[in-house]
A protein has these predicted regions:
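N-terminal secretory signal peptides
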Residues: 1-18, 24-34
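Bacterial lipoprotein signal-peptidase II cleavage site
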Residues: 36-44
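A short, well-structured edge-of-sheet supersecondary motif
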Residues: 71-103, 240, 358-362, 367-372
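Catalytic-site signature segments of enzymes, centered on catalytic residues
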Residues: 106, 171-271
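Active-site helix/loop module of the DD-peptidase/beta-lactamase fold
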Residues: 108-112, 124-168, 217, 221-260, ...
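Active-site-proximal alpha-helical segments within enzyme catalytic domains
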Residues: 160-163, 211-218, 259-283, 294, ...
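Active-site Gly/Thr loop motif
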Residues: 243-261, 265-268, 299-370
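Short, gly/Ser/Thr-rich active-site loops of penicillin-recognizing serine hydrolases
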Residues: 378-410
Length: 410
């Protein structure tokens, strides 16, 4: 039985009240437990320190500052304005315009057309309609209806796309816009089948329109369609180009090489084409050209004995002596050595136009870029070439900061 004690008024030796003694015991036990005295329980671990916050990416203005400065400095050399765009496989990461020219401006692109024409024909090779070994004599006939024969009938599609077919680069009679492509190619045959005119395949490189007119006519015969219909199905529609993007104002003798201005298109459309090539033939989830064909397109088409008769780079001092693939130049430090060029870290593929429109793909930089413009004077390509050389290392440097995509491409 618990007896309850109460204190008396004298404060003499009365026992401590039970409640006070119980509270004291509980408090003492709690204090000992808190101090760990006599306990096997481990003390709680301190909370881990938060991971350091990574620094934010630099703002776009600082990422592209050097590129902006180079474009702005060059702008006065472009009488009709210019736009420069850069794309990685995911899409466009840089765009800068001046002088009223934008990436939506639709203009003729001159010899930048050659790359598109060659890729259109490679699309037919991809589909099995043609092969790179298909010969002129397999598809073309002369004015008497007989297949092309003799050396001129042995020219392959690959020879034509590399401008090493042995044909002269230009035949004036074939350039009239009022005739058909079929008639133009008959005139080429009339001219080039004469004794002593044709060179052996791979003996010479002659930059010009003749090769692509013949290749385009082979495509028309193989498909039974006009060139514009071939281009529409092969690339224009898959790349989402506008129906206004046509060859030579839609005439019956399209300038497949870029003469008469070549294709009229916007820079934004051309960037889609470049990104397709950068992705090695993929666009919009579809395989337009195989990786093997893209590799063939980029490979050096010259032999050790190929002589450069005519090239747009001959007007530069020094002449870089760039070699050619299938409708694109191979820009590198040692173009005469195909193996060294292939592994050159500065290797670029390009197809510059006489109006200054200058597209290129930097293989090891993994980007595509284009100087978009229409110079007032045809042949004024130097400002675009100089700007390309200036921008190439600056773009690579900017891309190390992983800039954001500003215009995604499918």
């Amino acid at each position: 039985m618990i007896t309850r004690f109460t204190s008396n008024s004298s404060g003499t030796g009365s026992p401590q009240p039970l409640r006070r003694r119980l509270l004291f015991g509980v408090a003492s036990s709690a204090a000992l437990a808190a101090c760990g005295g006599g306990s096997d329980a481990a003390a709680p671990s301190p909370a881990p320190s938060p991971a350091p916050t990574p620094p934010p990416p630099p703002p776009p203005s600082s990422v592209w500052a050097a590129v902006d400065a180079a474009v702005d400095k060059a702008a006065p050399s472009f009488g009709n304005g210019l736009t420069v765009e850069v794309a990685i496989p995911a899409g466009v990461v840089y765009s800068r315009s001046s002088g009223g020219y934008t990436s939506q401006t639709r203009n003729p692109i001159a010899s930048a057309t050659k790359w598109v024409t060659g890729s259109t024909i490679l699309r037919l090779v991809q589909q099995g309609t043609l092969t790179l070994a298909t010969r002129t004599g397999d598809l073309l006939v002369d004015r008497n209806g007989a297949p092309w024969s003799g050396p001129i009938g042995q020219i392959t599609l690959s020879d034509l796309l590399s401008f090493t077919s042995g044909l002269e680069g230009d035949v004036d009679e074939a350039t009239a816009t009022s005739i058909t492509l079929a008639e133009a190619v008959l005139r080429i045959h009339d001219s080039q089948s004469k004794p002593g005119v044709l060179a052996p395949p791979k003996a010479r490189y002659w930059y010009g329109a003749t090769h692509l007119r013949v290749a385009g006519r082979m495509a028309e015969v193989a498909t039974g369609k006009s060139w514009q219909q071939i281009f529409d199905a092969a690339l224009r529609v898959p790349l989402g180009w506008d129906s206004a993007s046509i060859y030579s104002l839609g005439g019956p003798n399209p300038a497949l090489d870029g003469g008469d201005g070549g294709i009229r298109c916007s820079g934004e459309e051309y960037m889609r084409f470049l990104v397709m090539l950068l992705r090695k033939g993929l666009y919009g989830g579809a395989r337009l050209i195989s990786e093997n064909l893209i590799a063939t397109q980029r490979a050096d088409a010259f032999t050790a004995n190929t002589v450069i008769v005519k090239s747009p780079y001959q007007k530069f001092t020094p002449d870089p002596m760039y070699h050619y693939g299938l409708c694109n130049f191979r820009e590198c430090g040692n173009p005469g050595n195909a193996g060294a060029c292939d592994v050159d870290p500065t290797l670029r593929f390009s197809s510059p136009g006489a109006l200054g429109f200058g597209p290129w793909i930097d293989v090891y930089g993994n980007y595509a870029a284009c100087v978009m413009t229409r110079q007032p004077q045809q042949g004024n390509t130097e400002p675009s070439e100089v700007l390309k050389q200036t921008l190439a290392p600056l773009i690579r440097s900017a891309l190390t900061s992983n800039p954001a995509v500003i215009r995604p491409l499918p």
